[in-house]
């Protein structure tokens, strides 16, 4: 069975107490949740349920919203793809942060924040659609992207691991050059170190098509022939046959 959505093994006791009580709706707990987001960024953990609770508080109390905390939550959500975490967080953002500018002054004041959200949403789309090379190209194309993920310790490494997990589900072997682009590892030595030490995969340099990375068989990438047998008895059509005769009569 999967882990329940509202569970997190690394969640501190005081955060758990807030989430399971009425204080989760108390605006005074906003600072506690904000500190917890900082902790997640530093310790490479992710608590989607707690982050959603904070975003809900922002929704009810827009004046308490801290743009940096929101972008950190979204950046952390990128490190757990593929999952609905990013979309859920995005859906809870206050209306004035959405990329639909209005004629009032608030729109100009939040333009930088909205641009940040748009950029993070772009990264999410690329990851969820498995456009990994384009993801890294986009991430490296603008210093603002680097600023948006700067507070998330090990961001690039966490994303690489998630990409590797998805590759392992779909491939038994993959060309090393392609994998270099997907993982944004700029040298063959770095690629070999990552796939052998982090992923426990093998590098084969003897093949006719150049260097390939071999992924061990698992329940996701194993080729299996599926045999389906369907037995349809006459009794299953008894009602249809009877109705046919009844209509004819």
Swiss-Prot record:
Major localization class: cytoplasm
Location of the protein in the cell: Cytoplasm
Swiss-Prot/TrEMBL keywords: Cytoplasm, Initiation factor, Protein biosynthesis
Subunit text: Component of the eukaryotic translation initiation factor 3 (eIF-3) complex.
Pfam (any one): CSN8_PSD8_EIF3K
Family: Belongs to the eIF-3 subunit K family.
An example Gene Ontology CC term for this record: eukaryotic 48S preinitiation complex
Role, per record: Component of the eukaryotic translation initiation factor 3 (eIF-3) complex, which is involved in protein synthesis of a specialized repertoire of mRNAs and, together with other initiation factors, stimulates binding of mRNA and methionyl-tRNAi to the 40S ribosome. The eIF-3 complex specifically targets and initiates translation of a subset of mRNAs involved in cell proliferation.
GO molecular function terms noted in the UniProt entry: ribosome binding; RNA binding; translation initiation factor activity
Taxon lineage: Eukaryota, Fungi, Dikarya, Ascomycota, Pezizomycotina
Taxonomy, superkingdom: Eukaryota
Domain (PCI) ranges: 46-222
Protein name (Swiss-Prot/TrEMBL): Eukaryotic translation initiation factor 3 subunit K
GO biological process: formation of cytoplasmic translation initiation complex; regulation of translational initiation
InterPro entries, A to Z: ARM-type_fold, CSN8_PSD8_EIF3K, eIF3k, PCI_dom, Transl_init_fac_sub12_N_euk, WH-like_DNA-bd_sf, WH_DNA-bd_sf
